[in-house]
């Protein structure tokens, strides 16, 4: 039986590195397929008192196949799941063909994460998506994406500036009456980092928009329908330095997610 007092175990979907990436050496560890966890995500969760556990992906070339891995066992063993950022969502995952060779995305990761989403939702465990995680959650429930904002939505602000990464920022506005807005009483919005070139085009049925970019209206935060906890943001909360007065303090978002994870654990040990 799980100890309710033990630290929460939060799964983090793996980022994938495939050999042959431009500019990378073709020797040593770089000649291997890597599954990895960006350290800021780990530190963000650890800072909230949780223990991050990376969940690896498998594909048709793996020695271990999907049929050998019961994803519901991951969902049963862990208290929640974070979908971390990374490569583009593949256009094929939402019924489109890539408009440019650089926008192929990561179909393998898409498939694995969509299966993880289903397993955790079925187990009644909370999910939180970051950047790509927001986009994939939207796609998993029937939404679509802009493959490239500058090309397909030229009225958009710059949401990614080469060389600046998370140093690039813009203002967001909370949608009144939403759970996200309730976490920040008395505030209409804030500033966040921005380092993405894709974004939500068609919102998944039943999902609620919780924040938008103040400058162009692009969706920046969503919440899924039903009694479970499905939430995601387009920015990277793990890159926000605690106490930085220029940026949103994401501690309330993390605490809200971990509170849901603790509640899910209590339900699982009844």
PLM ranges: what are they?
Residues 132-134, 141:
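Active-site loop->helix "elbow" adjoining a glycine-rich segment at hydrolase catalytic centers
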Residues 231-234:
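Active-site-proximal beta-strand elements of phosphoester/diester hydrolases
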Residues 1-128, 139, 146, 150-184, ...:
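N-terminal beta1-alpha1 cap of cysteine-dependent amidohydrolase-like domains
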